[in-house]
């Protein structure tokens, strides 16, 4: 089991060194990893590391898409939820009543 681990470790080390040796400029490996980091941060929506401007733009765009629950009238939401729960219970009861007894 230990030999498999050492083999995998050696393979990973050789792969990384060969990939960096294949590029003519050794600094390009660092640039490629920086680009990957930026892309992964964009996907996660965590561009806060680049500055306050990006955070504000991101926050404004999400506020346009989704309204915050605090801005909505919560009493209407609670009433709608209670109504949906009551309808669900009534549907269950109607299924039980309609089943023929064997």
From Swiss-Prot:
Record's subcellular location: Secreted; Host cytoplasm; Host nucleus, Host nucleolus; Host nucleus
Residues making up the signal peptide according to the UniProt record: 1-21
Any one GO cellular component localisation term in the record: host cell nucleolus
KW Signal (keyword) present: yes
Record flagged with keyword Electron transport: no
Cystine residue pairs: none
Inducing factors: Expression is induced during host plant infection.
Motif RxLR-dEER per record, residues: 39-53
Subunit structure: Interacts with host KRBP1.
Domain topic, free-text comment: The RxLR-dEER motif acts to carry the protein into the host cell cytoplasm through binding to cell surface phosphatidylinositol-3-phosphate.
Function according to Swiss-Prot or TrEMBL: Effector that enhances P.infestans colonization of host plant leaves. During the early stages of P.infestans infection, interacts with and stabilizes host potato K-homology (KH) RNA-binding protein KRBP1, leading to its accumulation.
Family: Belongs to the RxLR effector family.
Entry protein name: RxLR effector protein PexRD41
Gene this protein is translated from: PexRD41
């Amino acid at each position: 089991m230990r030999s498999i681990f050492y083999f995998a470790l050696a393979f990973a080390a050789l792969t990384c060194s060969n990939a960096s040796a294949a590029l003519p400029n050794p600094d390009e490996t660092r640039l490629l990893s920086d680009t990957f980091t930026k892309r992964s941060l964009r996907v996660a929506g965590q561009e806060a590391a680049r500055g306050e401007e990006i955070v504000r733009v991101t926050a404004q765009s999400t506020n346009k898409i989704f309204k915050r629950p605090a801005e909505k009238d919560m009493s209407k939401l609670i009433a709608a939820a209670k109504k949906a729960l009551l309808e669900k219970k009534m549907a269950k009861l109607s299924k039980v009543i309609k089943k023929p007894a064997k």
